[in-house]
Amino acid sequence: MMFKNFPFFKGKKDTSFDHLVEEVKKGYIPEHIAIIMDGNGRWAKRRAMPRIAGHHEGMQVVKKITKFASKLNVKVLTLYAFSTENWKRPKKEVDYLMKLPEEFLGTFLPELIEENVQVRVIGQQDRLPTHTRRAMEKAMEETKENTGLILNFALNYGSRDEIVSAVQHMMKDSEEGKVRVEDVSEEMLSSYLMTSSLPDPELLIRTSGELRISNFMLWQIAYSEFWFTDVYWPDFTEEHLLNAITDFQHRGRRFGGV
């Protein structure tokens, strides 16, 4: 079932936010939270600003939410940063988006290291500009020994492309005698995906009011709980994330059972 905002905190304004955080942490925290960060352009348009201003503001929110997810002991935070379809956007906007990882990591990497955060990337990295790829590679190298939150960027990522690539690699291994047809299973296909070393997302969040998945982790979200909000990504706060997790904690996850 899909929900929008869950008014759990209504009437609790006299309770400190830190206390609410501690109460939520007593419950089950999703191991893997995936977020479709949507609405940067519309946020900027409403303020008569260029779309890139929305992306810049959204970058600041990534910093804030990453630190908060780490505080909540979330194990994996996957952020849909740039899809394989986003190349269709105006060149000026795409060029700016390709500079954002460099800017983001240039200022935030020391904090990520201090917070014990490990940076990872999924997506077709070979098509990224050299400066973008180098910024991501540097961050991954410098945080690879960290054991805290895994900050996983989906950059030039498309789920259908990922699944096709997985099947191609599986067929190649079959031709080389490494895989037998009778061995093919869900677990085997999962092992060929870019997320093979990560647990599937338990909670998927999408901002901006759009109610669609947009080719994001289609295989991995088979049993994820969805949480939608009308809030644009630049306005997304720690309270919104806490609200989503609280909603998650109040749902009954049956995985096809009763």
UniProtKB/Swiss-Prot annotation:
<feature type="binding site">
    <location>
        <begin position="39"/>
        <end position="42"/>
    </location>
    <ligand>
        <name>substrate</name>
    </ligand>
</feature>
<feature type="active site">
    <location>
        <position position="38"/>
    </location>
</feature>
<comment type="function">
    <text>Catalyzes the condensation of isopentenyl diphosphate (IPP) with allylic pyrophosphates generating different type of terpenoids.</text>
</comment>
<feature type="binding site">
    <location>
        <position position="51"/>
    </location>
    <ligand>
        <name>substrate</name>
    </ligand>
</feature>
<feature type="binding site">
    <location>
        <position position="55"/>
    </location>
    <ligand>
        <name>substrate</name>
    </ligand>
</feature>
<keyword id="KW-0460">Magnesium</keyword>
<dbReference type="InterPro" id="IPR001441">
    <property type="entry name" value="UPP_synth-like"/>
</dbReference>
<dbReference type="InterPro" id="IPR018520">
    <property type="entry name" value="UPP_synth-like_CS"/>
</dbReference>
<dbReference type="GO" id="GO:0000287">
    <property type="term" value="F:magnesium ion binding"/>
</dbReference>
<dbReference type="InterPro" id="IPR036424">
    <property type="entry name" value="UPP_synth-like_sf"/>
</dbReference>
<dbReference type="GO" id="GO:0016094">
    <property type="term" value="P:polyprenol biosynthetic process"/>
</dbReference>
<dbReference type="GO" id="GO:0030145">
    <property type="term" value="F:manganese ion binding"/>
</dbReference>
<feature type="binding site">
    <location>
        <position position="87"/>
    </location>
    <ligand>
        <name>substrate</name>
    </ligand>
</feature>
<keyword id="KW-0808">Transferase</keyword>
<keyword id="KW-0479">Metal-binding</keyword>
<feature type="binding site">
    <location>
        <begin position="83"/>
        <end position="85"/>
    </location>
    <ligand>
        <name>substrate</name>
    </ligand>
</feature>
<feature type="active site" description="Proton acceptor">
    <location>
        <position position="86"/>
    </location>
</feature>
<comment type="similarity">
    <text>Belongs to the UPP synthase family.</text>
</comment>
<feature type="binding site">
    <location>
        <position position="225"/>
    </location>
    <ligand>
        <name>Mg(2+)</name>
    </ligand>
</feature>
<feature type="binding site">
    <location>
        <position position="43"/>
    </location>
    <ligand>
        <name>substrate</name>
    </ligand>
</feature>
<protein>
    <recommendedName>
        <fullName>Isoprenyl transferase</fullName>
        <ecNumber>2.5.1.-</ecNumber>
    </recommendedName>
</protein>
<dbReference type="GO" id="GO:0005829">
    <property type="term" value="C:cytosol"/>
</dbReference>
<feature type="binding site">
    <location>
        <position position="89"/>
    </location>
    <ligand>
        <name>substrate</name>
    </ligand>
</feature>
<comment type="subunit">
    <text>Homodimer.</text>
</comment>
<dbReference type="GO" id="GO:0008834">
    <property type="term" value="F:ditrans,polycis-undecaprenyl-diphosphate synthase [(2E,6E)-farnesyl-diphosphate specific] activity"/>
</dbReference>
<feature type="binding site">
    <location>
        <begin position="212"/>
        <end position="214"/>
    </location>
    <ligand>
        <name>substrate</name>
    </ligand>
</feature>
<feature type="binding site">
    <location>
        <position position="38"/>
    </location>
    <ligand>
        <name>Mg(2+)</name>
    </ligand>
</feature>
<feature type="binding site">
    <location>
        <position position="206"/>
    </location>
    <ligand>
        <name>substrate</name>
    </ligand>
</feature>
<dbReference type="Pfam" id="PF01255">
    <property type="entry name" value="Prenyltransf"/>
</dbReference>
